[in-house]
Amino acid sequence: MGSRCLSFRVSILLVAACLFLSSALAQSALPNHLSKRVVGDYGYWSKYQNPPYGAAQIPYNRLTHINHAGISFDATGTLSVPDGFIEPELNSQAHAAGVKVMLLLGGDFSGLETSGQVQTLVDNVATFEQQYAYDGVDIDWEYPSSDQDAAFLVQMMSLFRQSNADYVLSFDAGPWGGSGYALPQVKQYVDYVNVMMYDCAGPWTAHGQLNSSIFWDPRDPAPYECQPGGSVAGAATIFLQQLPPKQINMGTPFYGYVYVNIKHLFDLCPNSQWTQDGECDNAVFSGSYGLNFKHNINRNGWRTHYDPIALVPYMLRVDGTNGYITYDDHYSTYMRVWYSDWVRHLGGTFMWALDQDYDGHSQDLLRAMYNASLGNAR
């Protein structure tokens, strides 16, 4: 795998040797011997996939919180609950392990911010949570951008907090930490903010970017495609200017992207020169670690390389033909979580999404997250 991989592995071992000293100082106030949050996003639809991933597959002993995704709502604040969403065994098994389960609401806010019906949404959520034994709410609004949006976000989080003082209340924010999130005002209402430090790669880029760099690589010819906050280090700095460390969770992806028409890291997609938006568009598609990438690591015509600055892997074709994959493995996941928890002293980490690490038998990335959060060796 080359000298870069060897250097990466050596650094992991050196770091792990130091972790026991720092972890010994941590006092566990969370389940499963953890003093840092490990939050897992879980989409109800994953139990219909092959292999299925549902309540029976979740390793509750490696988590502190679960965000249960799938419910939507409209401009009147009415909830839409899809068939198969309600899983009593999810909540009961999580609670038996001391793990909190939260409703993940958001994506598109469907005009709620201008309809005047936010109290209706809050009331409907409170009724649903009481009926099905949920512990709180995670808001995933992609993305508030205006002063009006910011004021609405503060109002909504305030109403959720008034609705139930015991809620675990959080929201998801892009790594740039823009003013639309109103962090100085909203922090009084939320337990923590989940920083979505991923998707620096994807069809919206013109170059073969890294999905989630731990540190920014200055060799990137197009840093504007994911700036500001284009790395874990950069995003942490932005959010630490507005929030205390314990109120921040750093995101880590269990998925990546395949670029089909480039051969190297940071290459320009040839088709970007004639696409309407100047991006790679349909020359890029996403894949999960467990099903799409794990079995190709140094196999099936692919070779793994490591960016020695960003500290994340990527794959290229052995024969030099087109094909570039940006993803995370257990080394980079461990490093990202360790850096976030123990160097920047954040409150924890979270991932999108639990099922994307699953290969039908094991979850390498979740195990790495848990061990790094504990301060254990890999």
Describe each region flagged by the PLM.
Residues T76-F85, E142-K294:
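Substrate-binding surface in catalytic domains of secreted glycosidases
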Residues L90-V101, Q131-A133, Q162-D166, Y189, ...:
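A structural motif corresponding to the C-terminal end of an alpha-helix
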Residues R62, W204, L210-S213, Q247-W342, ...:
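Glycan-binding loop/region signatures in secreted carbohydrate-active enzymes
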Residues Q27-E129, Q209-N211, G230, Q273-E279, ...:
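Glycan-recognition patch characteristic of GH18 chitinases/ENGases
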Residues I66, L103, I139, V193, ...:
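Conserved, mostly hydrophobic/aromatic
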Residues N124-F152, D199, F350:
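Active-site groove signature of glycoside hydrolases
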Residues M1-A17:
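Classical eukaryotic N-terminal signal peptides for Sec-dependent ER targeting/secretion
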Residues G2, A17-H33:
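N-terminal signal peptide
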